[in-house]
Structures are given as C-alpha cells and as structure tokens.
Amino acid sequence: MEPKEGGSPQATTLKRNKDKTMAKTFKKILKPGEKKKKQKAIVIAAIKQLIHYLETNCIELEGICRISGNNTKVKELKKQLENGEGDSIDFSKIDSHCVSGALKAFLRDGDEPLLTFDLYKNFLASIDIKDKNSKISFIKSLLSALPKENYDLLQILLKFLNTIQLHSSINKMTSSNLAIVFSPTLLRPKEESLESMMTDSNSISEVVRVLIEEFHVLYEIKQTLLYQVSAIDLGIREDKRSTSEQLEDAKVTIEQLKKHLNEEARERSILETYCTSMEQKLQELEDINKSLTEEKDSLGELLNEFKETNKNQANDINSLKNDIKDVTEKQTKTELERDELNKVKVKLEKDIETTRIELKSTNDECQKLKVNNNKLGEDIKNQMKEFEQTRKSLLENHKLEFEKHQLEIQQFRQENEQLKKEKTDADLQLERVQAEISILLSSSNDKNSKKNSLKNQKKDLDNALKKCKDQESKINQLEKEKSKLQDELTKLQKSSSSSSSSSSSSSSSQASHKFVFGKKPSSSKITTTTTTTTSPAQQPTTPPPPLDEDDIISVKKFAFYYMNLAIKTDAMTKGLPCNINSSEILEELLSKNIKVQQWSEVISKKLKENK
C-alpha cells in the first residue's frame, strides 16, 4: 500500500496543479460578479453626488438637464467618477450643463434601465388606464416589483426632477420637458428597433411625466417633508441622528449582512458541487478536444461564412444608424417647422384682427357714404323740383313775353297800314296839288286879279310839300323799324326753339346756380331778364340789344356741368366708375357744335369707355 501511496509523487503534483487551476477558474468566476457590484456601487454613489450638486446649486438654472454640455468634458467627468475620484472633484469649477450631461450619461450607459426590461410592457400598458387613481395604483405596484437599488435610486431621481418642475417658471423645464429628456434613459426595450422608437416614444415620455408629477403619491411622501428632506438625506450625507435611530439602522444592516452571509454559504455549496462536476468534465473535455480538432477544419468554412454574415450585419447596423440619424434630423426639422407654423399662425391672427378692424371701419365709411348719397339724392330731388318749378315759371314768362311781342307786332302792322293809308292820302293830295298847279299855270294870264289867290295856293303847296316830306321820313323810319322788328322776330323764334330743345339742360342751369364753373350764375339770369324786360319797355324807335356769345357759352357750360354731375351721381349710386375729364369733353362738344340734346348720350358713352 505504501509504495502505491508513496510511489505517486506525480499524482500529488497533478492534484496540486489541478487545485491551482480550479482556484484560478473560481477566481475568474467570482471576479466578474464582484466587479459588477463594485461598479454598481460607484455608479450609484456618482449619481447621488451629481444629483446633490444639481439640487443644491442649479435648480433655478434655465434649461437644466435639457441643454447638453461639452461632450469631451462630460466624458472626462464621467471617467473621474467611475474611477472613484468624486471626492476630489470641485463641481463649482465645472459647467453645470456638463454635470447634468454626466448624470444623463450614467443613466443611459447602464446595462439595464432603472425601470428594467421586464417591466417595459407593463409600464406602457398603464397609459391605457383612463382612471387616474387606478393608473397610479397600478404604477405603484409596478414600482414595488423593482429591485431595491433601482427603487431607492429612482426615488432620489424623481424627487430631484419634481423639485425642478416646481421651479419651471424660472428654469423653463416643465414635467413634460423633463420626461422628453429622461424617458429614453429610464425606460427602453431590450431590443430596440426603428418602429418601436417611433411608436413608443410618446407613450414612454407620458409614463415618465406621470412618475414626475405624481411622485408624492407614488412614494407616499408628504409635500411638507419633501422640502425639509433633500435627496442626499436618502443615502449620502453623514448621520446626525440619535443613537437609538443609529442602532436601529445598525440592526437593519446586520440583518442584511446575515442575509448576505447566507447567500455566500449557499454559493459556496454550489461551488463545491461545481468543482466535483468540473473534475468529471475535465476528462470529458480532453476527449472532446480530440473531436474538436477534427471538427476545427470543418468549422473554418463556417467561420468564413459567419464573418461574411457579420459584415452584412455590420452594414445593416450602419444603415440603421444612418436611418436613425435621418429620423432625428427629420424630427428636428419638423419641430422647427412647427415653431415657424406657430409664428405664422400668430401673424395670421394679428392680420385677421387688423383686417376685421379695417372692415369695420370700411363698413362705417360705407354707411356714412350711403347716408351722404341719400342726402345728395334728396338734395338732387329737391333741386330737380326747384328746377322744374323754375322751368315752368320761365316757360310761362317766355309765353307771356312772346304774346307781348306778337301784340307789339300786330300794333306795328296796324301802324304800318295806317302809314300806308296816309301815304296814299298824301299821294292823292300831291296829285291834287299838281292838278291845281297846272290849273294855276293855265290861268297865269289873269295875274293881277288872281295874285292873292296864288300866294295862298303857294303857301298851301309849301305846307303840302312839308307834310309829304314828313310823311316820307316817317315811312322810311317805319320801314327801318319793320326790318328791325322782323330781325328780332326771327331771333326770338330761334331762341324760343333752342330754349324748348334744351329745357332738360339749360333750364336746369337757371334752377341750380351753385354748380356753375367759370362764371357767376346771375349773369345768365341777367341776360335773359334783360332781353325779356327791356323789349316791352323800349320805344319803337330804339333797336333791341344783340345777344352776347359769352353769355350763351356760360349757359352751355352751366348746363354741361349740371348734366355731368347728375350722371356721375347716378353712376356712384350704382357702384360704377366715374373718372372722366369733364373739361376735355366740354371742349369736344363745343368744338364739334354738338346739340345740347345729345350731350347726355356723349357723357354716358365716355363713362362706359372708362370702365
């Protein structure tokens, strides 16, 4: 037996080597778990330290946690905190936006978000609950299902975010803005895709917003205590409590340590069983190595194929990254377009208000214009009535004057007939005188006896000759007066025909003297009254005064402007344009000698042409 036991030094060395290899493998197995725990503790301490600084110094900073700091400085700060150099860092010398950026980086770069991958769908399902109380109770149950570290750290973070949104009037960070910033870091799926990012982004931000706003209800903390206790009192600052409280905490920690020791004992038993199984597996592995060497050659081809597939997958990943960049750029563009549209909307609302005010003013002006037009129409109607009255009175005056002229003409005719009779009588007397002279000449022999009778007869002859001369002069005067009266009759007939034809235009000029341009309205009245009043008062010996052309032109101008005003007012009431150069039209009418009856047609044609 001894040679078997003592003759196995190689076996002892093999056992020692096996023990060493097993210890190394155990160390390799245990080290990753310990490293993860240490890293978790460092990350939690760093997050608490960052929250403490931001909560005490940067609550009222505008754009806190939204504005991103310098990327290189954020990475340097994160490395220092990961290396455990948090106590030596002076945060006052660092940009506060870089501090908030480091906080977001720690939350984003973790292996698993605080709300965990397993509860992702459950948190999204809470959005479909419409009742607020039932929604909060459901979310509270989900929070209780979280690991304790996640639960405590989430409490510190949500308290910090709640205090930020309470100062949103200063820092411009509402609960919705904070939810947009922190939703991708707190809640995300295990396998992200473009579709999930597009569809679930709004619902994720809504869940985080509810967590921020309902922090007091979810963690059952009174609002008064919230302002008395800061986030660091939950795990960073030194205890300033009584010994009894510290003892209670110590008891809790002892219980936790006991639980930890029990877990370690359980792990040791597991490792011992694992060692026995590993010894058995080592022999199996030696056999497997032989088979693996044989299969190695066959796996070369598979590796090449796998590399190609990896390349394709890398290309797909790059294309997906590019797509994500495009989507983010599109989102930024859409946000900018929304801002621009809102600005345009505000401008349009202002323009609409101004247009409404202008429309009101225009409506008021239109009403005023309607009132003025009504007044003008009434004035025009009154003027037309006055014009008709004056026209009737003028026509009556013309008729009376015409009748007077006819009576005078009849008187002149009667006087002319009397003068003709006197002339014939004078001719007869001349013949008689000549006969008497011939008789006297025949009886010239009886001079002496008849001297006295001859003298008397000579006197009679002289008287008769004087009478004949007087009668001839009277006859000549009467003939001249007759010719003048005939001329006056022709002129009066012409004037009466023109007055009757231009009764619609010239008589209106005599009715409304306010609208005469160039001459006073009284001049036309004076000329017409002088022609009518002087004719019956004149003696038959003096001729009537001739008509003045200036007066006729002034009457025509007055008639034109009155007609033009009436036609323009009709066009204004109908809403038609009435921009006409009246002076040019008047010159055309006067130069072409167009009748007054046709003036209204010419003016209306000009109005239609200017449309």
Swiss-Prot record:
GO terms for biological process: signal transduction. Pfam families: RhoGAP. The record marks 66 as: Arginine finger. Residues 476-550 are annotated as: Disordered. Its main location: cytoplasm. One of its GO terms (cellular component) is cytoplasm. Keywords: Coiled coil, Cytoplasm, GTPase activation. Residues 495-509, 527-540 have a biased composition (Low complexity). The keyword Coiled coil applies. GO terms for molecular function: GTPase activator activity. Residues 476-491 have a biased composition (Basic and acidic residues). Residues 236-499 form a coiled coil. It is found in: Cytoplasm. InterPro entries: Rho_GTPase_activation_prot (IPR008936), RhoGAP_dom (IPR000198). Residues 24-219 form the Rho-GAP domain. The keyword Cell membrane does not apply. PANTHER family: RHO GTPASE-ACTIVATING PROTEIN 68F. Rho GTPase-activating protein involved in the signal transduction pathway. This is Rho GTPase-activating protein gacN.
